[in-house]
A protein has these predicted regions:
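C-terminal motif of bacterial Sec signal peptides marking the signal peptidase cleavage site
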Residues: 15-18
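Sec-dependent signal peptide recognition
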Residues: 2-9
Length: 180
């Protein structure tokens, strides 16, 4: 019985050892922008606005922007970090009252499709949904974040702050802003 246990333990430890990842030997900052100085260089489709006493890129309402980064250099990993403000009536995985208008409010981050690292389109974009909607009884517009679409999580799941001031006004203005 001991030999079997030791054999299983050795097999299990070698499995974990082979699944280890290499250490990151250096960090190189490639792009940084607080937008406070109105700098939109290397950005197409971006506009600036003020929210909560700071300058932000946006509002986008069914649109987006592109950041062009040249001469990134050879790398094994890319770490992307930013503050994402979700304003107004994002309805997550389910949007609209009629069967024809029930399409998700998707948020997509895409990387250059010609990257030689991956040829599978699933690896060069991150697609998820967000919901700022409240839940009432059985009525709850779920979101996918922090998972990929079409996962189902409660509204505002994973938000850093879900009670920031309201930016959008009017009938479809929705609730407060959420920060991710």
């Amino acid at each position: 019985m001991r030999v079997y246990y030791l054999s299983a333990l050795l097999s299990l430890s070698s499995f974990f050892y082979t699944c280890s990842y290499p250490e990151i030997s250096s960090d190189v900052l490639v792009y940084e922008n607080s937008f406070e100085n109105d700098n939109l260089s290397n950005i197409d489709g971006g506009g600036l606005s003020t929210f909560n006493n700071t300058t932000v890129i946006g509002d986008f309402n069914n649109d987006g922007f592109t950041i062009h980064l040249d001469d990134v250099g050879d790398h094994d990993y890319v770490f992307v970090s930013f503050d994402l403000y979700i304003h107004g009536s994002w309805d997550g995985n389910f949007n609209g009252n009629s069967e024809k208008s029930r399409v998700p409010d998707k948020w997509i981050m895409e990387f250059k499709p010609e990257m030689s690292l991956y040829n599978d389109p699933d690896y060069y974009k991150y697609e998820t949904t967000f919901s700022n909607s409240p839940c009432f009884g059985n009525y709850c517009l779920k979101q996918s974040y922090p998972n990929l679409y079409p996962f189902s999580n409660n509204p505002k799941t994973g938000s850093f702050n879900s009670e920031l001031p309201r930016k959008c006004n009017g009938y479809f203005g929705g609730p407060s802003t959420s920060l991710y």
